[in-house]
C-alpha cells in the first residue's frame, strides 16, 4: 500500500511516497512496522543558484587635466598670483623695513634672484593643479582663506608699487 502525502503541513516533501506493509496476523512476536521514507529532491531550474556578491568595480581614474582646464577662470592662475603676491608683499615689506629702499630699487639690484624665486613658486603651485589635488584645510588655513589673503596681497602689492612709483620713496 502506498500513501501519498500532499499536505503542506507535513514534514515529508509533497509528492513523496511512503511504503507501508501490514504485519502478518499469525506472528507470535510483537508486530513490527516497517516504514520506508522515500524522499526525492529536485533541482528547480527556475531559480538561479545563489552567488556570492562580487565586489563593485573600482571607479575610473579621472583623466589628467589639460592646460586650458588648469589655467581656466578660477583655476590655478588666481591661486598662483595670490601666492606670489603674498610672498612678494611680505618680502618687500621686510626688505623695506631692513634697508629703507623701495621695491623698485630692490628689484633693480637683484632681478635674476627675484625672477628665479617667482618661477620656482609658480612651478611648485602648478604641480598640485595638474595632479587634480585639492587643498586640505589645516586649522585656519583653508583654501578659501588662501584665496582671500591672496586677493588682498595682490591689491596691497599693487598699491605699494603704485605709491612708490609716484612718490619715488619707500612706503615703510
Curated annotation (Swiss-Prot):
Entry GO CC: chloroplast membrane
What organism is listed for this UniProt entry?
Answer: Dunaliella salina
Listed A to Z, the keywords are: Chloroplast, Membrane, Plastid, Transit peptide, Transmembrane, Transmembrane helix
- Biased composition of type Pro residues is found at 46-63
Q: How does it sit in the membrane?
A: Multi-pass membrane protein
Briefly, what is this protein's role? Answer: Putative zeaxanthin binding protein. That forms photoprotective complexes within the light-harvesting antennae.
Instruction: State one Pfam family annotation.
Output: Chloroa_b-bind
- Using the UniProt annotation, give all residue ranges assigned to the region (Disordered): 41-66
Q: What parts of the sequence cross the membrane?
A: 111-131, 152-172
Cite the InterPro entries for this sequence.
Chloroa_b-bind
Indicate whether Membrane appears among the record's keywords: yes
Q: What is this protein called?
A: Carotene biosynthesis-related protein CBR, chloroplastic
Q: Which gene encodes it?
A: CBR
Q: Which domain of life is it from?
A: Eukaryota
Amino acid at each position: 500500500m502506498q500513501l501519498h502525502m500532499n499536505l503542506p503541513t507535513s514534514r515529508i516533501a509533497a509528492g513523496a511516497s511512503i511504503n507501508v506493509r501490514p504485519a502478518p496476523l499469525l506472528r507470535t512476536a510483537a508486530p513490527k512496522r516497517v516504514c520506508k521514507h522515500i524522499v526525492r529532491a529536485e533541482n528547480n531550474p527556475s531559480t538561479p543558484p545563489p552567488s556570492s556578491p562580487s565586489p563593485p568595480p573600482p571607479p575610473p581614474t579621472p583623466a589628467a587635466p589639460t592646460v586650458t582646464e588648469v589655467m581656466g577662470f578660477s583655476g590655478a592662475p588666481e591661486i598662483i598670483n595670490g601666492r606670489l603676491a603674498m610672498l612678494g608683499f611680505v618680502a618687500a615689506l621686510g626688505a623695506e623695513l631692513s634697508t629703507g629702499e623701495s621695491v623698485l630699487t630692490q628689484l633693480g639690484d637683484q632681478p635674476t634672484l627675484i625672477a628665479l624665486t617667482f618661477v620656482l613658486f609658480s612651478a611648485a603651485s602648478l604641480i598640485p593643479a595638474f595632479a587634480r589635488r585639492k587643498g586640505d584645510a589645516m586649522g585656519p588655513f583653508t583654501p578659501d582663506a588662501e584665496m582671500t589673503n591672496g586677493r588682498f596681497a595682490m591689491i596691497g602689492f599693487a598699491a605699494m608699487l603704485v605709491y612708490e612709483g609716484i612718490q619715488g620713496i619707500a612706503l615703510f
